[in-house]
Regions:
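Catalytic core of the metallo-beta-lactamase
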Residues: 58-128, 135
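Divalent metal-binding segments
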Residues: 79, 189-192
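Solvent-exposed, acidic/flexible segments
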Residues: 6-9, 24, 60, 103, ...
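Divalent-metal (often Zn2+) His-rich catalytic cores of metallo-beta-lactamase-fold enzymes
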Residues: 97, 124-181, 185, 189
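Active-site neighborhood of phospho(di)ester-bond hydrolases with catalytic His/Asp-centered motifs
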Residues: 1-6, 22-26, 85, 104-107, ...
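Active-site HxH/HxHxD metal-binding segment of metal-dependent hydrolases
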Residues: 1-64, 68-72
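Active-site environment of divalent metal-dependent phosphoester hydrolases
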Residues: 5-11, 28-31, 90-93, 111-116, ...
Length: 192
């Protein structure tokens, strides 16, 4: 399952040799539109990590199956819901929800003890998407980065921490832009 189109997800997935690779239609569209650029950018920014980039099979990992909004899989008796609950980190954000176990795999919509990457973010939508995740009432959550959240209290802390960062950045940028500040001043005010 590709949680979104970023190279950190799409480059390494081929190493698993999976028969099927699932992505949302939005994620597939973003791989088509930006995947190669994102791959080249990652390689350029982190050459130490890509010393043997030619060893990555097939470069980008392409989905073999796509879905729109929801797909349900059964792994024996285990129900796995693959959901798009809104935009946030990217347009194609996808989560995996195990309703019987109340475990949520959030992709990069939630990051714990890590700063969320927001280069492709939908700041206005992300808080509502976090509300949509919370509405599932997960008791455990595996974030895109950071330790697994093992209790409902930790899950709430992870959601709240991500929300606080996104909201703080958005409100700071919005206030600076309303004052007509140039980009450098907006950056300085936001990350001061």
């Amino acid at each position: 399952l590709l949680s979104h189109y970023h190279a950190v997800r799409v480059l390494g997935a081929s190493a698993y040799g999976a028969e099927h690779i699932i992505a949302s239609e939005d994620t597939r569209d973003l791989i088509v539109e930006r995947g190669q650029f994102d791959k080249d950018s990652e390689i350029g920014r982190f050459p130490r990590l890509f010393q043997n980039v030619e060893s990555v099979p097939d470069g980008l990992t392409w989905p073999t199956m796509t879905f729109n909004k929801k797909m349900t899989l059964w792994l024996g008796k285990l129900e796995v819901q693959i959901l798009q609950l809104g935009r946030g980190h990217t347009k194609g954000d996808t989560v995996a929800w195990l309703p019987q176990e109340k475990i949520l795999f959030s992709g990069d919509l939630v990051e714990f003890d890590a700063t969320p990457y927001a280069g492709d973010a939908y700041f206005k939508d992300w808080p509502q998407t976090l509300d949509n995740l919370a509405a599932l009432k997960p008791e455990k959550l595996v974030p895109g980065r950071g330790a697994a959240l093992q209790t409902p209290e930790q899950v709430q802390a992870g959601l709240a921490g991500t929300r606080a960062f996104i909201s703080d950045v958005y409100e700071s940028v919005k206030a600076s832009a309303a004052q007509g500040e140039d980009l450098r001043k907006v950056y300085e005010a936001t990350f001061a």
